[in-house]
Amino acid sequence: MKPRVMILLGSASDFRIAEKAMEIFEELRIPYDLRVASAHRTHEKVKAIVSEAVKAGVEVFIGIAGLSAHLPGMISANTHRPVIGVPVDVKLGGLDALFACSQMPFPAPVATVGVDRGENAAILAAQIIGIGDPGVRERVADLRRGFYERVRRDECQVLNSIEGSYYAPLEVEMPPIGDKVPSDSQDDPMVSVIPGSYSDMKIAKKTTMFLERMGISYDLNVISPIRYPERFERYLEKMENVKLFIAISGLSAHVTGAVVALSDRPVIGVPCPLKMNGWDSLLSMINMPPGVPVGTVGVGNGGNAAILAAEMLGIYDEKIESRIKRIKSRSVKF
């Protein structure tokens, strides 16, 4: 049995975060390996681990680190496989590590998840593997239904504890949870790119430009889940066979949250600097609750979103893999 995921820790103290990821991989039956290597103190060891892991067939890397958290970025600089970054709360509430993971230069993206969210890193890794492995995708769908059931149980506990005289609960009929895993079609685009508004189009066009140059088919639709919720859901149903989503949004960044709530495909988030220099959308995208990860890139970095999409798709597509290798080796310059 060979590992499909490599987990690298910046220090042994990060193991408590890795345990969350390992529990998910055990449940999903995805083989993994784990090593401890510092980007600053054992630079050559990191490079050696990444190189050997790629040769051994590892499909996804997870870098877990706190403080300056350069480990995920260093992994990305040395591989064409997708890298997920988990910032760890050591100081400053983990914000230092969060910025270090997400704000990577082109073309070295890190799909950053929330602070200490090892479980979301594992789920995102499984979603990426599920692009070309229907069995893994089905198990991820089952896992997500388990999170739904957990919320239902928590609600029952809360409601059963209410003793107020004026508590008047309504009867709410809940819709069934979808369990259909759609079949792929050759006619469907690989990627759906969803800007939340026309003000996000400049970044969206940069994203699609790189997708086109890497030969990745896509659909582009400007639609807001806040202004047009029903239309948004209909569009997601139409795009059920895409392999991944890229959501581009500023402000509270509801687009990414809405997409990941309605699809089990990987979601890449691109925060836009409409207000607060993009801090609001960056934090809203990254810090998702357990079970619904968004792999977030740097503020306004549509190019890195496209590169990350290519890294994910390249696991199962040799042509895309070849193109992303050339880009990351700097033999091709856009």
Swiss-Prot record:
NCBIfam families in alphabetical order: purE
Homology family: Belongs to the AIR carboxylase family. Class I subfamily.
Keywords, alphabetical: Isomerase, Purine biosynthesis
GO MF, one example: 5-(carboxyamino)imidazole ribonucleotide mutase activity
Organism field: Methanothermobacter thermautotrophicus (strain ATCC 29096 / DSM 1053 / JCM 10044 / NBRC 100330 / Delta H) (Methanobacterium thermoautotrophicum)
The protein's name: Probable N5-carboxyaminoimidazole ribonucleotide mutase
EC assignment: 5.4.99.18
EC top class, as a word: isomerase
SMART domains attached to this UniProt entry: AIRC (SM01001)
Keyword presence, Isomerase: yes
Residues noted as binding substrate in the record, renumbered to the chain: S11, D14, R41
HAMAP family xrefs: PurE_classI (MF_01929)
Highest taxon above the source species: Archaea
Biological pathway: Purine metabolism; IMP biosynthesis via de novo pathway; 5-amino-1-(5-phospho-D-ribosyl)imidazole-4-carboxylate from 5-amino-1-(5-phospho-D-ribosyl)imidazole (N5-CAIR route): step 2/2
Job description of the protein: Catalyzes the conversion of N5-carboxyaminoimidazole ribonucleotide (N5-CAIR) to 4-carboxy-5-aminoimidazole ribonucleotide (CAIR).
